Protein backbone atom coordinates (compact mmCIF):
# COMPACT_ATOMS: atom_id res chain seq x y z
CA UNK A 1 0.00 0.00 0.00
CA UNK A 2 1.16 3.49 -0.75
CA UNK A 3 -0.03 6.89 0.41
CA UNK A 4 -1.95 8.75 -2.24
CA UNK A 5 -1.28 12.42 -3.00
CA UNK A 6 -3.35 14.68 -0.82
CA UNK A 7 -2.63 12.78 2.37
CA UNK A 8 -2.41 15.08 5.37
CA UNK A 9 0.98 13.61 6.26
CA UNK A 10 3.81 15.40 4.46
CA UNK A 11 6.44 12.72 5.10
CA UNK A 12 4.38 9.97 3.44
CA UNK A 13 4.06 7.89 6.59
CA UNK A 14 1.04 7.47 8.81
CA UNK A 15 0.25 6.32 12.33
CA UNK A 16 -2.21 3.47 11.80
CA UNK A 17 -4.28 1.89 14.57
CA UNK A 18 -5.56 -1.62 13.84
CA UNK A 19 -8.24 -2.97 16.15
CA UNK A 20 -8.09 -6.75 15.90
CA UNK A 21 -4.91 -8.76 15.57
CA UNK A 22 -6.37 -11.85 13.92
CA UNK A 23 -5.51 -13.07 10.44
CA UNK A 24 -6.76 -9.96 8.64
CA UNK A 25 -5.38 -7.51 11.20
CA UNK A 26 -2.00 -9.25 11.19
CA UNK A 27 -1.86 -9.16 7.40
CA UNK A 28 -2.67 -5.45 7.36
CA UNK A 29 -0.09 -4.78 10.08
CA UNK A 30 2.55 -6.61 8.05
CA UNK A 31 1.81 -4.60 4.91
CA UNK A 32 1.74 -1.28 6.74
CA UNK A 33 5.01 -2.11 8.54
CA UNK A 34 6.62 -3.02 5.20
CA UNK A 35 5.80 0.51 4.07
CA UNK A 36 7.36 1.81 7.30
CA UNK A 37 4.18 3.23 8.78
CA UNK A 38 3.85 3.61 12.55
CA UNK A 39 1.50 0.71 13.41
CA UNK A 40 -0.39 0.03 16.64
CA UNK A 41 -2.45 -3.16 17.07
CA UNK A 42 -5.11 -3.61 19.76
CA UNK A 43 -6.26 -7.12 20.61
CA UNK A 44 -7.57 -8.88 23.70
CA UNK A 45 -5.28 -11.93 23.33
CA UNK A 46 -1.76 -11.52 24.75
CA UNK A 47 -0.39 -14.50 22.79
CA UNK A 48 -1.56 -13.04 19.50
CA UNK A 49 0.09 -9.71 20.30
CA UNK A 50 3.33 -11.41 21.38
CA UNK A 51 3.44 -13.24 18.04
CA UNK A 52 3.03 -9.97 16.14
CA UNK A 53 5.77 -8.34 18.23
CA UNK A 54 8.25 -11.09 17.41
CA UNK A 55 7.90 -10.58 13.65
CA UNK A 56 7.02 -6.92 13.17
CA UNK A 57 8.22 -3.51 14.33
CA UNK A 58 5.01 -2.22 15.89
CA UNK A 59 3.34 -1.29 19.16
CA UNK A 60 0.69 -3.53 20.71
CA UNK A 61 -1.97 -2.82 23.30
CA UNK A 62 -3.84 -5.62 25.03
CA UNK A 63 -7.48 -4.80 25.64
CA UNK A 64 -10.92 -4.24 24.18
CA UNK A 65 -10.75 -1.98 21.13
CA UNK A 66 -14.24 -0.68 21.91
CA UNK A 67 -13.17 0.50 25.37
CA UNK A 68 -12.30 4.22 25.54
CA UNK A 69 -9.50 3.56 28.05
CA UNK A 70 -7.87 1.07 25.67
CA UNK A 71 -8.15 3.51 22.78
CA UNK A 72 -6.61 6.22 24.93
CA UNK A 73 -3.72 3.89 25.85
CA UNK A 74 -3.18 3.28 22.12
CA UNK A 75 -3.12 7.07 21.61
CA UNK A 76 -6.02 6.99 19.15
CA UNK A 77 -6.05 10.79 18.91
CA UNK A 78 -2.71 10.68 17.07
CA UNK A 79 -3.89 8.08 14.56
CA UNK A 80 -4.16 9.07 10.91
CA UNK A 81 -6.16 5.92 10.19
CA UNK A 82 -8.15 3.50 12.34
CA UNK A 83 -9.01 0.06 10.95
CA UNK A 84 -11.33 -2.30 12.85
CA UNK A 85 -11.24 -5.91 11.66
Where in the sequence are the language-model features?
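Cytosolic regulatory regions of ion transport systems
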Residues: 1-85
Amino acid sequence: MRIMPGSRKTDGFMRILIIGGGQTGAHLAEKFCEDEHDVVVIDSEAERLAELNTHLDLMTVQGDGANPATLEEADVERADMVVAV
